Regions:
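Helix-turn-helix
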Residues: 9, 13, 17-55, 59
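Hydrophobic alpha-helical connector segments
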Residues: 55, 68-104, 157-162, 186
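Residues in soluble alpha-helical coiled-coils and helical-bundle/repeat scaffolds
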Residues: 47-51, 55, 100, 117, ...
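Hydrophobic/aromatic-rich alpha-helical bundle segments in the mid-to-C-terminal region
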Residues: 123-127, 144-196
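N-terminal intrinsically disordered/low-complexity leader segments
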Residues: 1-5
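Amphipathic alpha-helical packing segments from all-alpha helical-bundle domains
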Residues: 65, 70, 100-110, 120-146, ...
């Protein structure tokens, strides 16, 4: 039980440190201090800093995908007929460029992606979570397509685009006064998605 409790404390402490100082600033010593444990015990649980980051960042990404899955539960249900969940329904649930919440998530995602090249353990975990997100998004997109002959290739491309929105929002935030408005963005997506169904 103590072993399990210490692991949970370490994960909670690492999440706190990531929110405070980001991936680059995270120090195992600080995590140990906040978790009221030792660096050696952290290494016993996670092998090294890379292992700790892989576990914690992977968990955080999975938690966000859980929220995504809950948000689109109707579209993901096997009992929902294809086409009952419409493009309009999809647009109502998708994040918009100027959402502060999703801009923050985008920055977190960018930090995580930047760390992948030097952390094979993190890459392996984020590959799993990214593929999970893509599979869920692909099902949502397919269910929103009312075409008589759906194009599965289009579905895959749109699913990739939708699951990568947070990164688009970061770029939009950097445009300053030239930012794309939420209305422009939503109008374009509606026209784009509808054009794929003709």
């Amino acid at each position: 039980m103590e072993n399990s409790n210490s692991r949970e404390r370490i994960i909670a402490a690492a999440k706190h440190e990531l929110h405070e100082v980001g991936i680059l600033g995270l120090r195992v010593q600080d995590v140990a201090k906040r978790a009221n444990t030792s660096v050696s015990l952290i290494y016993k649980h996670f092998e090294d800093r890379d292992g700790l980051l892989a576990q914690v960042l992977g968990d955080m990404h999975d938690e966000r995908i859980d929220m995504w899955e809950q948000l689109f539960s109707h579209a993901l249900s096997d009992s929902t007929p294809r086409g009952e969940f419409t493009v309009e329904d999809l647009l109502l649930k998708l994040p918009t460029p100027n959402s502060i919440h999703f801009q923050t998530l985008g920055m977190d995602r960018a930090q995580t992606l930047a760390a992948l090249s030097n952390n094979p353990k993190l890459r392996a975990r984020i590959e799993q979570t990214t593929q999970r997100l893509f599979a869920l998004t692909l099902k949502v997109v397919a269910n929103a397509d009312k075409s008589a002959e759906p194009n599965t290739s289009n579905h895959r491309v749109v699913a990739l685009m939708v699951s990568s929105l947070n990164l688009i929002f970061i770029n939009n935030d950097l445009l300053g006064d030239h930012r794309i408005t939420d209305a422009e963005y939503t109008s374009f997506l509606k026209a784009f998605f509808n054009s794929l169904q003709k």
